Curated annotation (Swiss-Prot):
The modification Phosphoserine is found at residue 48. Residues 1-27 form the signal peptide. One of its GO terms (cellular component) is extracellular space. It comes from the Eukaryota. The keyword Secreted applies. It is found in: Secreted. This is Cocaine- and amphetamine-regulated transcript protein. GO terms for biological process: adult feeding behavior; cellular response to starvation; chemical synaptic transmission; circadian regulation of gene expression; G protein-coupled receptor signaling pathway; intracellular glucose homeostasis; negative regulation of appetite; negative regulation of bone resorption. It comes from Mus musculus. GO terms for molecular function: neuropeptide hormone activity. Pfam families: CART. Its main location: secreted. The modification Phosphotyrosine is found at residue 41. InterPro entries: CART (IPR009106), CART_C_sf (IPR036722).
Amino acid sequence: MESSRLRLLPLLGAALLLLLPLLGARAQEDAELQPRALDIYSAVDDASHEKELPRRQLRAPGAMLQIEALQEVLKKLKSKRIPIYEKKYGQVPMCDAGEQCAVRKGARIGKLCDCPRGTSCNSFLLKCL
């Protein structure tokens, strides 16, 4: 009985190895038939295809003004350029000696800048001394 199990085990393993490529090919065909979410959205930032909200869905009379104000803010944020010192972490612009500065630790009051060599930002006066 034990010898028949030992003979059957390699045969089952060989059959499984032969069937695996066939099962993998079928799964690959199924994956190719499914639509991809990336194909639905275009890479172009064109807002002309976006839907407008129907006016009956707007409940407040000032809602249109709020939407227009938000759209203006979004346009400004898109056009705003980030200063180089904000992009590079750990690097901030230099302050002049005696100018108001900000401490990097804790709550910060004042302009974010680093004091020149030989001076340090006084946390009480918030000036480069």
